Curated annotation (Swiss-Prot):
Domain of life: Eukaryota
Family (UniProt): Belongs to the UPF0512 family.
Designated name of the protein: UPF0512 protein I
Organism name: Dictyostelium discoideum
Amino acid sequence: MTIFNSISSISNPTRTALSSINTYNYNGSSVNDNSTAYFDNDFGGWGGLGDFGNGNGCGGGSSNVNVINLDIDFGRRRHRRCC
């Protein structure tokens, strides 16, 4: 099983951190996704790091919160589309 990890270090104590550990099946391969997202209290940015099984992380730096999709789905094959 290939494990993809992403680590986000948050230095600002005023940020709220959301973290999730998600194991799912991606194109027949088992993937463990550890991702962290955070939201600034000044509403200036929503960021995150994560690999979704294809080697490409999504998110980080966009000030439009409408494009962020936090979708946690356990035990299903799924295709993620982001950005």
